[in-house]
């Protein structure tokens, strides 16, 4: 599962099992807002993180997290002739919450807008989050909802934590995730997932 639930790929066959995309018509509008407010903005193709604005340390982090090469493009709105899985704003933590609210006001009726960390603002297809993706996956696999376990640490994990039979917050999770979780495990750096497997499986 990738792109905050926007795409599910069968690990063995490498085939896409499920995918939801956003309309590319929003990219010029999102890019305009990013440039006017000195924010970073990226979207994705099959192999790269496409940088539509200036590079910043948060864009470099995202490229590292998802193991994709960052590619700066001055005319990304012309290059993207397909509907992408998502776009991502990057912003300094001191202003990210403010911009999240403004972007929600501008695009919230057409797109899902939420922070996944203090410096990432996700732009997703309407109705798409990790919970929706898990619902699709377990229906395909025939797994009851009550038998699911979801582990997360960021704002973008909240819906998934609420949906799962057991919602688990990592020790390093934001407070909002810890408040919703049924159980808190160790951090990402201290085998927190292993602890969950040993306890519940």
Regions found by a protein language model. Name each.
Residues 163, 168-201:
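Asp-based, Mg2+/Mn2+-dependent phosphohydrolase catalytic module
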Residues 1-25:
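Alpha-helical substrate-recognition element adjacent to the catalytic core
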Residues 5, 84-85, 164, 181:
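Short, well-ordered alpha-helix to beta-strand connector turns
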């Amino acid at each position: 599962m990738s792109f905050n639930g926007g795409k599910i790929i069968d690990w063995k066959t490498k085939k896409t099992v499920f995918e939801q995309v956003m309309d590319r018509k929003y990219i010029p509008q999102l890019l305009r807002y990013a440039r006017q407010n000195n924010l970073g903005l990226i979207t994705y193709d099959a192999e790269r993180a496409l940088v539509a604005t200036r590079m910043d340390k948060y864009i470099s982090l995202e490229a590292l997290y998802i193991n994709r090469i960052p590619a700066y493009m001055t005319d990304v709105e012309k290059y993207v002739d397909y509907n992408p899985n998502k776009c991502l704003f990057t912003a300094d933590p001191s202003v990210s919450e403010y911009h999240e609210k403004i972007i929600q006001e501008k695009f919230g009726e057409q797109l899902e807008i939420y922070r996944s960390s203090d410096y990432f603002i996700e732009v997703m297809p309407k109705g798409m989050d990790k919970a929706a993706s898990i619902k699709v996956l377990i229906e395909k696999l025939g797994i009851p909802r009550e038998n699911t376990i979801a582990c997360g640490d960021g704002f973008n994990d909240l819906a998934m934590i609420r949906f799962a039979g057991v919602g688990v917050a990592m020790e390093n999770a934001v407070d909002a995730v810890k408040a919703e979780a049924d159980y808190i495990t160790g951090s990402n750096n201290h085998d927190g997932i292993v602890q969950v497997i040993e306890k519940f499986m």
